[in-house]
Amino acid sequence: MSHTKKPTIEKIILALLGLLALAALVRTMFLGLEIDEEYALSLGFRLVRGDRLFYSMWEPHQLAALPPALLIGLFTAVTGTTTGVLLFVRGAVLAVKLALAVWFYRSLRVALGGRCAYLLALAVLAFTPKWFLGPDYVSQQFHFTLAAFLFLYGYYAPGPRQYRGLWRVAAGGVCACLSFLAYPQTLAAAPVLMLALLLLGRGSADKCRGLWVFVLTCAVCGGAFVVYVLQGMGFDFAALLARADLILHDPQYDFTTADRLAMLRSKLSAVIGNCWLSALAGVALAAAGMLFGERRGFARSLEKALWYTAFFLSLWCTAYCLRAQELDFRYMCPAFALAGGWTFWCDRREAGHRPLRRLLFWLGWLPGIAAYLFILRSTLIALPTTFMYLFWPAVCGTAALLLKPRPTRRHRAAAALLAAGLLLACAVPRLCLVLETGWHCEPITAIQPERITRGPAAGTWADTKAADMQDACMKPSPPMRARACSRPSVSSTASAF
């Protein structure tokens, strides 16, 4: 093949992958309804209509109501109605995702190379934790975490603007606080981030300014939030503590560490059963490399086996989703995160690209792992479902492959294949499958989409069953009680609009 044809084919493939990611998101924007998305919007709408956090709202996820409330408030102020607000919110989230993906690409293009930065940016663009675009607490946590990383990376990254523009650190602190607010369990990442800023600024008083600005910003944001909540309760601090205690002791989260470990152990065999074939193939390829003359040592051979396993799992997850019609299948995320962590460890003493590796490790990978471990302890969801929280460490781990001391063409090609595998696992199932009511998926070719013309979901399409349910919800019904302690049903969620 001539040298002129090779770049042309590569550009065509990259363009097709970009179209795949966009097509998956556009499909998600216009087709499908999901109860968690409606629930997230109903929390925001309750703030718009006058309910107050911890006073007339009792849901455990109420802290994630502020961003949806801003979007819904803007929409209702302009239009005077909630008809079509779901499509507006989805469009706003899609615009934010596009901006973050472009920002990610521009920030890391020099460090990672244009091709791999582009593929990882597409993976970040295509990924939504719960398969819908609405800003629920998990989606907010991921996207605010990404924004915080990009702000902090812009301040600490080597280059002419390093340690300039403290506003970046302040903005990163605001985004980190919004991430913690949306999903309080991820607060475990805060001490890791503070330690990271301390280590990255070590050796100079000027460099340490970033840490103090970050801490001060977090303190101001925390204080402002407490004042906002208190003013809705008549500044009764004792009442706020009592309400918070009641919400934090929700019966559905009343389990011990031993109970949680038992739950996780019960799912471990299923995880191993779905991963062993890919792991065996990865080990076999790494062993074959050693047999045919590669003298890499145990640590490097294990690194190679882990990355082979991660790549095979990304392909397996994509194929399994289409075969079993299952959207919640992300075993590749812990594989990528684990392989990336091992790469960081193997390269810890290498001088080449060390500053960039430190940034990815301390600002991206390690805070993500810390947050995941605390989520793993504090949530009731099944072990495989928690893997969605490892997507960000998986992205950081893949980027670490390109920050080798002496990256070769093989390293760049391997990183590109891994990033493409991550992208396919995120985009293909969402493009080809549609989530139906009852957590069940159907191929997009098998459903009969029906356009919704009334209510908050107007302008979107859904399968006939979900559309009929949405239409039934728009019939007159009693308003949702402000003090409902349990999670609303589909009917009460829709009637809240």
Residue ranges and their predicted role:
Residues E59, A190, P429-F497:
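Short periplasmic/luminal acceptor-recognition loop of GT-C membrane glycosyltransferases, typified by
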Residues C116, F151-L178, D206-L216, L360-L366:
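Short hydrophobic alpha-helices at membrane interfaces in multi-pass membrane enzymes
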